[in-house]
Amino acid sequence: HLQIPNHLLEELSVVHPQDIHMNAVVIFQAAQGMEQSGWIRLPFCNTLLAEALGATPTLSVAGARIKEPAFAKPEELMTIQVQETARLCAMFEALAQLSKAGKKVAYNIEGPLTLLCALLPMNKVFSALRKPVGKQMLSQVEEWIVRYAEMAVERGAKIISFADPIATVDILGSQMFVNQYVPCLLQLLIRLQERFPDTVIHLCGKLTQSLIDTKQCTLTRWEGQKGQSYGQTLTEFCGEGGIVGHYCLNYLGASRNYLELIDFTEKRNKNER
């Protein structure tokens, strides 16, 4: 996850975790201090949505971690709704203020499996995926992520960035990745694109690579102006909407004047047959 540098924590007099996790003004200032190549990235940890669904994170000034899953079995997840926790409210208040100040924000959201593994023991997630309850579980996680993305876009996020470190071919195996994970991801992306046609969706490099390796998508290169950084190229593209990826937002300042557009049309057509 994105980490606030120590010098910035000192400048902002952040001593206790609450100073950065619960204070929209400090989040706003920290985010501005970390702007790179015209972009601000939020949030500073990957536990906000899990917490809004019932997980209990351990907070530190460096971020937040979930040590113990809040639930024991998939059936317990089926009626849960996203709650507006104090941390979520502070983060979204900062996001709204940054957008109001004319800043461009890329908002990171955990993908379906990483989110589920923050709520349930990992072995329960994987065993559920092999059973009928797995389909229900993935459908439920899709609802949560769409709702969370809506909350971010409504407050001005220009890019929704997806990372799902647990969802790689190496971890899942190609059969589970292609047959269970990809349909869920595809449905999620279709819904987000329909709901927010002008918002760019950025898939992390590892997830894109797994999609390429299993022939689930095709890539098209989109060229920006010469000599630009990756961040500047994203700015030029922004507003066009679409899914981009095969690269990492950690490298916004890197020299890269093109984007890789991700197309699932062939996969979508096969599913509809």
Language model regions located:
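Active-site-proximal, glycine-rich beta->alpha crossover segments in alpha/beta enzymes
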Residues: 56-151
